[in-house]
């Protein structure tokens, strides 16, 4: 009877340990793609876009005025191409 209790306890402890190890490795695997993508798409200071006084196509125009050739959409508040049906 004692051997059965001990073997059940060891089995349960082994399953808990296995769960902890699997969870730890899975959480590391979830972080790996994020780290990889952030290193691939990291923006270097040399390649940053210049800050403009105006907003370009499909840029938010709440605080900035749209660049020439674009108008601020009254509905979406984005800079869009002018059209007769847009105000």
Swiss-Prot record:
Where, subcellularly, is it found? Secreted
- Primary place of residence? secreted
Q: List the disulfide bonds.
A: 54-67, 61-72, 66-79
Q: How is this protein annotated for GO cellular component? A: extracellular region
Q: Name one GO molecular function term.
A: ion channel inhibitor activity
Key words, A-Z: Disulfide bond, Ion channel impairing toxin, Knottin, Secreted, Signal, Toxin
Q: Which residues form the signal peptide?
A: 1-24
Propeptide, chain numbering: 25-52
Name the domain of life this protein comes from: Eukaryota
Tissue-wise expression: Expressed by the venom gland.
Q: What is known of its domains?
A: The presence of a 'disulfide through disulfide knot' structurally defines this protein as a knottin.
- Function field: Ion channel inhibitor.
Q: Which family does it belong to?
A: Belongs to the neurotoxin 10 (Hwtx-1) family. 51 (Hntx-8) subfamily. Hntx-8 sub-subfamily.
Record protein name field: U3-theraphotoxin-Hhn1a 5
